[in-house]
Amino acid sequence: MSVVDQKAVELPPRISEAGVADYFALLKPRVMSLVIFTALVGLMIAPGHIHPVLGFIAILCIAVGAGASGALNMALEGDIDVLMSRTANRPIPRGRITRGEAMGFGLTLSFFSVMTLGALVNWYAGGLLAFTIFFYVVIYTMGLKRRTAQNIVIGGAAGALPPVVAWAAATGSLSVEPLLLFLIIFFWTPPHFWALALFRSDDYARAGVPMLPVVAGPDATRLQILLYTIVLVAIAAAPWPLGYFDWVYGVTSLILGAGMLVLAIEVYRHRTGSQALRATRRLFAFSILYLFALFAVLLLDVVAKAVAPLIW
C-alpha cells in the first residue's frame, strides 16, 4: 500500500456538514478570478459585436465551468489534499463535504455551464468549454498529476483555454489572437507553479505527487523555470511586431517580461538558504501580477478605443 493509500483512510468521517461557504470553496475562487479575467479579455478583444447579455452569459458559463473543474478536482484529490498543508483546510479533508457530494456538484455545474453556453451563445464555444473541463479533470487530474513531472506543462493547456472559449463565444470561430493568448498562459504556467513547488516541495513529496522539484531536484527545476521564462517573454512580446497588438501592449510586455526574467535569474542563482526561498516566493507572487497586468493592458486598450470617439 502506498503512502497516499495508507493516509487516505485517515480522512475525517464522511458526514456532510457543508454550508454555502464550503461549496463556494470547492469552486477554487482564486483560480476562478483569473479565469474570469482572462476570458473577459478574450471576449473584449474579439472583433465584431456580441450582445452584452450574451457576453455576460458567456463569461458566467466559463466561470461556472472553471468552478466545476475545481470541484471535480477536489473530489478526485481528497486523499492527497489531506496530506498537504496548503490544501488540508479544503472542505473535503476537513470532512465538511463528502467526495461524492463534491463529484455530484461538479458534474451538475459542468452539465449546466456547457449546455447553457451552447444553447444560448453557440455550440462551438460550448464544445470548447466541455473540452476544457474534460482536459482538466480527466487528462490532468486523473491522468497526469500523479504520474509525470510534466503534469503542469501538459495540464497547463486547460488553464490557457478560457480566453479561447470566450473568443469563440463572441465570434463563433477562432483566429491567431486567441491562440496567442493561449500560448502566453500556457508558457506562463510552468514558471508560476514550479516556483510554488520549490517552496512547497515537502508537501508534494509527502503526498506522492511527482512535481518537478521532487522528481528532478530543485536545481533542475530552477533551470527549467529560467528556460520557460525566456520563452514566455519572447512569446508575450511577439504579438506587437507581428501586428496583432499595439505598441502600448508591446512596451508593457517588455517591461513586465524584464521583471519576470530578472526574478527567474535570481531563482536560478540563489539555490540555498533564505535567499533561495525569498527568490522563489518573489517570482511566484510577481508571476500573478505579470499575467493580470499583461491582460489588463489589452482590456484597457479596447476600452480606450471605444471611449475615445466619445471624448474627441
Swiss-Prot record:
GO terms for molecular function: protoheme IX farnesyltransferase activity. Pathway: Porphyrin-containing compound metabolism; heme O biosynthesis; heme O from protoheme: step 1/1. The chain crosses the membrane at residues 31-51, 52-72, 119-139, 152-172, 179-199, 225-245, 247-267, 283-303. One of its GO terms (biological process) is heme O biosynthetic process. GO terms for cellular component: plasma membrane. It is found in: Cell inner membrane. Its EC number is 2.5.1.141. Keywords: Cell inner membrane, Cell membrane, Heme biosynthesis, Membrane, Transferase, Transmembrane, Transmembrane helix. It catalyses: heme b + (2E,6E)-farnesyl diphosphate + H2O = Fe(II)-heme o + diphosphate. Pfam families: UbiA (PF01040). It is a multi-pass membrane protein. PANTHER family: 4-HYDROXYBENZOATE SOLANESYLTRANSFERASE (PTHR43448:SF7), PROTOHEME IX FARNESYLTRANSFERASE, MITOCHONDRIAL (PTHR43448). Belongs to the UbiA prenyltransferase family. Protoheme IX farnesyltransferase subfamily. This is Protoheme IX farnesyltransferase 2. The gene is ctaB2.
